[in-house]
Design a protein with these regions (language model features):
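Short hydrophobic beta/alpha edge segments that flank linear recognition/processing sites
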Residues: 29-46, 67-85
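Short peripheral tails and domain-boundary helices/loops at the edges of structured domains
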Residues: 52-67, 90-93
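Acidic, low-complexity mobile loops and tails
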Residues: 1-37, 46, 52, 86-93
Length: 93
């Protein structure tokens, strides 16, 4: 049975600014695959998908400030519904 989750950045992280989508609506993403790029003003980071699935909706645009609890993207997964944790961005380079 498919279920949906909304990808969020972990609350322990500082606020970020959204830079770029790396996948578009309708794309399949794998576990750990980078779905977007964000910046903290000094460095850029990739945000990985915690589960494999189909991207169905983006909630942010270029330049948006991402605050604690903001959803970035909605992804549909196959299988039994499980809790999907917020992710920590991975520094580029």
């Amino acid at each position: 049975m498919p279920f949906m989750y909304e990808l969020k950045v972990a609350a322990s992280e500082p606020s970020y600014t959204f830079v770029q989508r790396l996948v578009s609506v309708g794309s399949l993403v794998g576990t750990g695959e980078a779905v977007c790029t964000v910046t903290d003003g000094a460095m850029e980071f990739h945000v990985p998908a915690p589960r494999q699935g189909l991207v169905v909706e983006w909630f942010v645009e270029h330049g948006a400030v991402i605050e604690d609890g903001d959803s970035l993207v909605r992804i549909v997964c196959e299988g039994d519904e499980v809790e999907v944790p917020a992710v920590e961005p991975v520094r580029l380079g």
